[in-house]
Amino acid sequence: MKGLVIYKGKYGATKQYAMWIGQELRLPVASADRFPVDELPKYDYFILGSSVYIGKLEIRNWLKKNFDLLQNKKILFFQVSASPPEQIEKRESYNKASLPSSILRKIQFYYLPGRMIMRNLSAWDRFMLRMGARLSKDPGEKKAMLTDFDHVKKENILPVIRAIRILKEVNEPETELA
């Protein structure tokens, strides 16, 4: 089976995960913005990665535009967000706000923790975070919105790696030697 990792992110965490996944599985890795879509039919499965920006998946427009080329392929999707992976309902709401149900039901999702380093954000993004923090009534949430964190670790990709290895075992059974 021939696979490809495609990602779209804003500040580097999604790209880092994509590179680690590609390295671990020996797969090519490409930015959604730079990959020639006419090459998509050559692949049997895809690992898509996207960061979340203002409650929406960064890769949403690319995925909607190109889904016809992907829909008969196996798709695993890793979402990278500031929201903790255990906040499944919140993480799922980002998917639902970004993609139609016809796409959602054909994708296997994985939620990976992200990073936020205030000094690396654009002036606009820092402003938006400060405004969001001011509007928050929860003091803990307010503080968290303005505090640097980096939860991007290589071991976070293990569930994605396991899923692909299982997929490949199922679709490429070992042949017995005569």
Residue ranges and their predicted role:
Residues Y45, G55-A178:
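FMN-binding flavodoxin-like domain, especially the glycine-rich phosphate-binding loop
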Residues M1-Q71, R162-A178:
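N-terminal beta1-alpha1-beta2 submodule of the flavodoxin-like/Rossmannoid cofactor-binding fold
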